[in-house]
Amino acid sequence: MRKKKNKKTVADTGYKKVDRKEKKKKEKQEEKRRQKKLSVQQSIAYKEMGKDGICRVQGKTYSKCIRFYDINYQLAQNEDKNAIFENWCDFLNYFDASIHFQLSFINYKSSMKEFEQVIRIRPQEDAFDDVRMEYAKMLKQQLAKGNNGLVKSKYITFSIEADNIREAKPKLERIESDILNNFKILGVPAYPLNGVERLQILYETFNPDIMTDFQFDYGSMIRTGLNTKDYVAPTSFVFKDRNTFRMGNTIGAVSYLQILAPELTDKMLAEFLDIDKNLIVNLHVQSVDQMKAIKLVKSKVTDINRMKIEEQKKAVRSGYDMDIIPSDLNTYGGEAKRLLEDLQSRNERMFLVTALFLNTAKTKQALDNAIFQTAGIAQKYNCVLKRLDYQQEEGLMSSVPLGVNHIPMHQYYNMATMINADVHRLFPSIDITMKTRLNSRADFEVTVLAIKTYPMERRVQ
């Protein structure tokens, strides 16, 4: 009897083991099915957005965003211009290798009714009503021949690596304070964005065809059970095409700028931002560690010298003057030595820069026309605007001010490449427009960042 009982127990245990294996197998299959179900919210590349404006973008990456305005540079005295130029150099030199920063220039079309509401002047039924009506008529005429409802805004987003929010918050607040102080020295109005304001930028970027105001407060998340992504997400994302994408009823495309010219002026970026279409220009900038940058340039100088020696050996073997070597070697060699001198003795930094352009439109034809116009400006300055192939999703998420670059294509620049000596367009005279959907205060014309390139290191990875 005991033996039979033992056999039955063994058999029962075997059945239980089989059941457990099948159960685990089914659980794994269900988990795979759940992972395959993609959503719009999963495409939006951040984890959490706090009330104070601190965003956990991915893993250990945290970011904050500052909106900045403009100052009057053209009418300043020469001494003031020199001071602004030097302070702007110090501003860019502030960012070390531990801080990634992103400059965003956003142009979007707002409703003309919204502008008309701002300039509307109601009669007060007094002796000055005639003056008010005449002034209101003048404003409407200026609006009719103005910027067609184009609103321009600009932001700087900076991100750091930290183990948790407790470690990230004091670091981000210190960097924010330093940046605001640098802007104050420059005389540039600036203020940090809170969580709602940052979410509004995402909402307006992902929903350019929706003219309704952004409605959100953190208290509603508790009542509804939704998260912040649910409030900013469009109705759909479609990334099946090679070099375009769709978000809701809008079609868009992300391109990157390949700089081929030996030198650029700030006029190029100014022309990009003068386009009367929806356009977002982003410059992702990462400072290179000083020792690493010097080592890199030294290796380039060594490579150029080795190439010179090889050319001289060829000249001797061929029986002509060894001083006759390709002119490019002399040019690149001189540029490399000057760059090394700047890094070692002039307290300059080297930067990795990615320039991205996001065009959006309602139809494919309108998008092609906008991209053609943008590419024409790039071609005018001997640059190439290239569409991202099969990287439109990464390009879109790199084109919103979150402080993370998902596109690995970049170019090397030193401090002189980030600023042009002709900075009269860096801070142009103030041009007051109407209020934006972000804030009720007056908005100002876009500040233009000048870029001057060196031919020494011009590669796309």
Question: Positions of the model-derived regions?
Answer:
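Active-site-adjacent "gating/activation" loops or surface patches in catalytic cores
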Residues: 422-461
